Amino acid sequence: MANGKTTLGLVVGNRGFFPDHLVESGRKQVLEVLEKAGIKVVCLSTSDTKLGAVETREEAEKCGRLFREHTDEIQGVLVTLPNFGDERAVAQTMRVSKLDVPVLVHAFPDEKGKMGLVDRRDSFCGKMSACNCLTQYGIRYSLTDSHTVDPGSDEFLAELEQFAAVSRVVSGLRGATIGAIGTRPPAFDTVRCSEKILEASGISLEPVDLSEILFAVHALKDDDDRVKARVDAVKAYFAVCDAPIEAVTKIAKL
């Protein structure tokens, strides 16, 4: 996904008695995937905290403050657990950040033959603990389809693309003003909506009389450069086939 418009905050979990090298390599791998996906990342550096991860309360608060400084940029937060992770640090990071954005919790899978003290992740259980703690803190989150996912897999990239898209939609709709053209046709109850519910989500509805739109359309000339450019865009978007040019032009003006 080549999309540089998405900015995600990254929280890397760690837990002291689990192998640190898994956090070091896991953080690097996730950052590489995010870069490949064209996603801008806001995260702690390895000079900010141990391994650039969060484990202690102090590290969580440092990460939370960093996110708060980038509130206007961050559209979503990815929590990744290369090892078990510290659930309190993950939740505390989100609490301090005061962000109200989509959160995706990801866990690394363990590998057969690497279940000893040196290489065991136990992220499977760590994810359940982190999610439980987030729930206690009242922080909403979403999960990957598979409980654990290899960051190098196509499955993870697909999860990332979907989450980035959701984050962009949420970010775009908050504070948006939607134009409602004309009144609702009496026979179509399916298009009813509540302005109060929309406003509660930060979305304003601005009614526009249909006559105003039609007046503006009639004022446009067929040879207007803006109209011709839109006609070309309509033709490029779908096959107009035998549609009359007049109809295509009217669509372009609208």
Label every PLM stretch briefly.
Residues M1-S171, G175-L254:
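Metallocofactor- and cofactor-centric catalytic cores in central/energy metabolism, strongly enriched
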